[in-house]
Swiss-Prot record:
It is found in: Nucleus. Keywords: Developmental protein, DNA-binding, Metal-binding, Nucleus, Receptor, Repressor, Transcription, Transcription regulation, Zinc, Zinc-finger. PROSITE patterns: NUCLEAR_REC_DBD_1 (PS00031), NUCLEAR_REC_DBD_2 (PS51030). SMART domains: ZnF_C4. This is Zygotic gap protein knirps. GO terms for molecular function: DNA-binding transcription factor activity; sequence-specific DNA binding; zinc ion binding.
């Protein structure tokens, strides 16, 4: 920067408080303006020379010179702006002042105040200018003239209705310096402030009316968008809940079928035995149901009477539509083959007369399936396959057969021990029979304890063996000798 300080003559650091000053004079003016009561009067009647060497000798004369060069507290109204911006604003002030002075007194000689011969003549000249300016303030057409001569000011300031005040012409730097020198020292603060004031939206950009309105509109928009998003989220959650929640199916109470006094054997199939191959009636109707329907176990009768066949068909349909499986019927993991073999140690032949029509329906249902499936290992109500060596080749069937053989062996031993006990108790005396009976009963109890875990492995068939006798169990099964 090729500028020098207007107060002391040192190289200027920038445009501060309305004038090019160094850092020292800038700091001095900032401190003295706020603490003007601590500055004493000049002892040399205000004739001290302020330069680079003796600028600190007299504070009163230094502050007076700061005012003379145009420094003011209002000069810092621009804030931390560039020097170009500050100088541009100052040049606009000079332009405005020159236009106002030329318009108010055409015939008046506006020579330089520094050409006046004495200090008193300068004061009188400044007073004359102030009086003329006060008269000029009463004219109503001054704002119109300023708007016509300087139409570029409103766009520069960014405020369409902003105009400079009327007493703008009195703030020419030379006139201000002369007026400050003519007044007493402590009356310098009574001088009018700078006329060049920025509009409120430039001084306080965060508090302008339009900015506040824009912020309010943005807040309202954000609130509306938040409400809209909440409504969309609630609708989406309701839709997903209705989509992924299975509908509740009312359980149809099954009407109990009248059972005859001497009912045949009821063999309960678990849900794991007939998930894919049901009996012919339930399999033909399961295609119209949803693929997620849980098939319940079906009570299958070995030799159902002819008059009860329609009733069994309806009962199996209603039970296959109910969604809740029966835990008591599906508790045994044994297959239908092992269950039927547990009833008799000999081979069981299929009943051809009862299964002729059901076999045709099962073959039609198997042909209607989507893909080929091997049904050789599947079981159904309609057909009871004859048992050969290939049906029990799996490891699971071998374990089940071994447990079943042990069960029959232990049961035979218990029967033999019981018979022996009865014969011994009838032939011997009372004392000896009591001792032998007690020992024999202890052995029977041990055998019964061994039988209980084996029978507990298959609760449905253990209970079946207890509740039914051998004659009713083998009523409808043909034994091949």
């Amino acid at each position: 920067m090729n500028q020098t300080c207007k107060v002391c003559g040192e190289p200027a650091a920038g445009f501060h408080f309305g004038a090019f000053t160094c850092e020292g004079c800038k700091s001095f003016f900032g401190r003295s303006y706020n603490n003007i009561s601590t500055i004493s009067e000049c002892k040399n009647d205000g004739k001290c020379i302020i330069d680079k060497k003796n600028r600190t000798t007299c504070k009163a004369c230094r502050l007076r010179k700061c005012y003379n060069v145009g420094m003011s507290k209002g000069g810092s109204r621009y804030g931390r702006r560039s020097n170009w911006f500050k100088i541009h604003c100052l040049l606009q002030e000079h332009e405005q002042a020159a236009a106002a002075a030329a318009g108010k007194a055409p015939g008046h000689a506006t020579g330089s105040p520094m050409s006046s011969p004495g200090f008193g003549d300068l004061a009188a000249h400044l007073q004359q200018q102030q009086q003329q300016h006060q008269q000029q303030q009463q004219q109503q057409h001054q704002h119109q003239q300023q708007q016509q001569r300087h139409p570029h000011l409103p766009p520069l300031l960014g405020y369409t209705g902003y105009h400079l005040p009327e007493h703008f012409g009195a703030r020419h730097p030379a006139d201000a310096a002369a007026a400050a020198a003519a007044l007493p020292f402590f009356s310098m603060m009574a001088t009018p402030q700078s006329a060049f004031q920025l509009p409120p939206h430039l001084l306080f950009p965060g508090y302008h009316a339009s900015a506040a309105a824009a912020a309010a509109a943005d807040a309202a928009y954000r609130q509306e968008m938040y409400k809209h998003r909440q409504s969309v989220d609630s609708a989406a959650s309701a839709e997903s809940h209705s989509r992924y929640t299975p509908p509740t199916v009312a359980t149809v109470p099954q009407q109990s079928q009248p059972q005859p006094a001497a009912s045949p054997i009821d063999v309960c199939l678990g849900a794991d035995d007939d998930v894919q191959s049901q009996h012919s009636h339930s399999h033909s109707h399961s295609q119209s149901q949803s693929p997620h329907t849980i098939h319940t176990p079906v009570a299958i009768r070995a030799t159902p009477p002819q008059q009860l066949l329609p009733g069994l068909t309806t009962a199996s349909h209603s039970s296959s539509a109910s969604p809740t499986p029966s835990k008591s019927q599906s508790s045994s993991p044994l297959s239908f083959t092992a269950k039927m073999q547990s009833l008799s140690p000999v081979s069981v032949c299929s009943i051809g007369g009862e299964t002729a029509a059901a076999n045709a329906a099962a073959s039609a249902a198997a042909a209607a399936q989507d893909g080929p499936m091997d049904l050789s290992m599947k079981t159904s109500r309609s057909s009871v396959h004859s048992f050969n060596d290939s049906d029990v080749c799996s490891l699971q069937d071998e374990h089940e057969l071994a447990a079943r053989r042990k069960y029959y062996q232990l049961e035979a031993e218990c029967t033999t021990i019981t018979n022996t006990t009865n014969s011994c108790s009838s032939s011997t005396s009372t004392s000896s029979s009591n001792s032998s009976t007690s020992s024999t009963e202890a052995a029977v109890a041990v055998k019964r304890q061994k039988l209980n875990p084996i029978g507990g492995e298959s609760p449905p068939f253990g209970g079946f063996a207890v509740t039914h006798n051998a004659s009713s169990a083998m009523r409808s099964i043909f034994v091949c000798v």
